[in-house]
């Protein structure tokens, strides 16, 4: 993972521990957690939450897999934060579901120092775009709903952002962290967004309003560039690129999102661009009915960890990205050291790498995920125009509808990169593939495995391992389509009726 094998995120009285899955551990492995030398729990997942801790105190946690020490970490709990209740003086927000609270909430956020936490109690707090800053915490209590409006005006001004791999000005997101600069490091850091409540935006209604407004604004451009529009997924693609996210992080470092329901962004729900050390855990992502409504999207970002989350999305549950075509190649900031484990999909497209991957994607580790109820399962994709690479991917002990490594034709507008992409060094171990994809609430039979590289010599799919794969279907037989591939190893492939 990073420099050791056990990591922590702590509050005043609790700590979430998480660790890399040992190479010898298979599905159902058990771990013993020690705190200051004493065993406190046995668990079957690669994370555990410690509770009833003392504030401002140092602890050592050790994790064992059998007799093997997975690793240790020393952590310190935080001080008890000073609570800035948004419903009290001098903020006076009203959680009645009717009052627009943008100004009141922003005042509380602006007043929040490193020793404070903006506290949102139960209620529905209608708001427009909000702007967070370094060294702050936002806490939503149980029953608290931070509800973004469905009005375009509440997401002004447009801000520098990146969407589907291209930098552009997009509407402000509901929560905005940092300022986009592909040539710089972090300008927003040490932010905690947590609690038991819900952060929701205007979803499909807001998305449709923005697309219609942008289509009118761009009607002459779209008419003059019909060939460009034809290269897109559909006629809404270009107008839809200015939609806000639910949570947008640009040039951020050390952000923790924990315990929340993240719901109905007008496009993607959590988008991290040029960011580092982002942890999201124990969250629920909901965006069914929102076109292109991805869940968790690291984009030219590093050291991003996602675990113990559930997805019911209108797009990919997870989409790992790094820019598009020549711009992405030139900026050249890869997404790397991405870890996804113990996540579950109930609707949506699954876990995807690409298709915007021109800056490169490397060191992606996925384990213990259930993507049975998804359309694409586990997918690595790009168009021939992209350039760049995907390499060093490991997927272990997962169940999915299917496994796809292939080229795709959509989102293919714009100038091509000087060379085709390369997918290489991909390992898939102990997967169960159902061969049934979930789309629009119904299951369809799909090819359980597709492997394809690119047709230019030197850009074939390289060094792929399929080990311990079980394919389920009604007949007990299958085909394995392989195209433009060099160095494919297959061990213990089982086809079961």
Feature-to-residue mapping (PLM):
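Extracellular/periplasmic carbohydrate-active domains that bind, remodel
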Residues: 1-497
